[in-house]
Amino acid sequence: MSEMAPRNYFEFFQLPEMFRLDQSVLDSHYLELQARVHPDKAAHLSDVEKRLSLQWATFANEAYQTLKRPLERARYLLRIHGVDTREEDNTAMPAEFLLEQIEWREEMQDAIAGRSEAALDRLGFRLKKEMDHLIESLGAMLDVQQSHPDAAVLVRQLAFLEKLKRDLDQAHALLED
């Protein structure tokens, strides 16, 4: 690998700077790069070359982890375009979205109290459908409309849903014990 750093993660994997990307292409580029820069491949190299190989492998892992997850990929794209999602200090959401969150959390608590995995499964199905819809909308906003401020709102909503998904996964684990 050359010592010249790529401009961004998309360039590193030779991918277009877009939200919608072919996961199989990302995976194959990642595996190809890992095969070339993995520290085990550098055992015969000088200390400087080993360190450089480790840096490239670390960069490849970080880039891959960011681009393979829709929420992280959207955040990264917005950052490239100078848009701060302000997730830490801007929790303003449409009232309908917030009411839905409250309703879903209440459903989850009821399912836990009733030890109903079926109710958790139904909630998980609806949550996945909503997340898929948001991801599709993000693709349109980022790739077609290039409406970055509006996309930042969707990123904040998707972050809420991902948190709910983690909580739902924990609820499933709780019922399995």
UniProtKB/Swiss-Prot annotation:
Residues 8-82 form the J domain. It comes from the Bacteria. GO terms for molecular function: ATPase activator activity; protein-folding chaperone binding. Keywords: Chaperone. The keyword Transcription does not apply. InterPro entries: DnaJ_domain, HscB, HscB_C_sf, HscB_oligo_C, J_dom_sf. One of its GO terms (biological process) is protein folding. Disulfide bonds: none annotated. It holds the Pfam family HSCB_C. One of its GO terms (cellular component) is iron-sulfur cluster transfer complex. Co-chaperone involved in the maturation of iron-sulfur cluster-containing proteins. Seems to help targeting proteins to be folded toward HscA. Interacts with HscA and stimulates its ATPase activity. Belongs to the HscB family. This is Co-chaperone protein HscB homolog. It comes from Methylococcus capsulatus (strain ATCC 33009 / NCIMB 11132 / Bath).
